[in-house]
Amino acid sequence: AHVPYAELLKGDETFKTYSDIGCKYIVIPWINEEYLAGGEKNAEFYENVKKFGELANKYGMKLCYHNHDFEFKKVDGEYKIDLLYKAISPDLLSTQLDTCWVNVGGENPADFIRKYAGRIEIVHLKDFAGTKGGNMYALIGNDDSKKEAAAGSFEFRPLGSGLQDFPSILEASKEVGAHWVVVEQDEPSMGKSRMECAEMSINYLKSIF
């Protein structure tokens, strides 16, 4: 489950609820940059993540972090995402790696999966076309006018219709023992409906197995 930071701060109440409904993973889906390395709320965030990890363990779940591309900005020569995983031990924080944003951030997704072998629980399979720039995050929001503008230069695609090398991503995921791979496409594209995009991704995966 993707659970907003504000909900995680409620502590036992939130974690017990998700445990009671059978969740295995509780995921930090997004955090403002002020909470990451170099930000004024970074120390506070790291301490809270440790508490969240302990609570997840208490209730029989694992805490994961879902990345975007801004975690691939550097502070003192290191990526913010690497500094996060350095600060929080693997028993308290696992990885839900979004391969689209890894690529947009400038790294090879398969290589980055292998970098965190033993910590990767979930891999998001997400394809895209276009280049980094503009308001890419409008595509994961609710403002239709912004979505249309952003889609002009960058769009999410059904698997196999964009720039990603999924055979290498899937091979790396298998090598490191990822428990789940999840197809994700935030918005439909290519003139297709949501269900048509899902069908295209399913058929693509069938074609490479």
Where are the predicted features?
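H/E-rich (His + Asp/Glu) clusters that bind or coordinate divalent metals
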Residues: 167-169, 180-183
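C-terminal helical cap(s) of enzyme catalytic domains, especially alpha/beta-barrels
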Residues: 192-209
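Short beta->alpha connector loops
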Residues: 3-9, 31-32, 100-108, 163-164, ...
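A short, acidic, amphipathic alpha-helical segment used as a generic capping/interface helix at domain edges
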Residues: 161-174
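Active-site acidic/histidine proton-transfer and metal-coordination neighborhood
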Residues: 1-95, 115, 195
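A short, acidic, flexible beta-alpha connecting loop/helix-capping segment that sits on the rim
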Residues: 182-193
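Acidic/histidine-rich catalytic cores of soluble enzymes
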Residues: 57-163
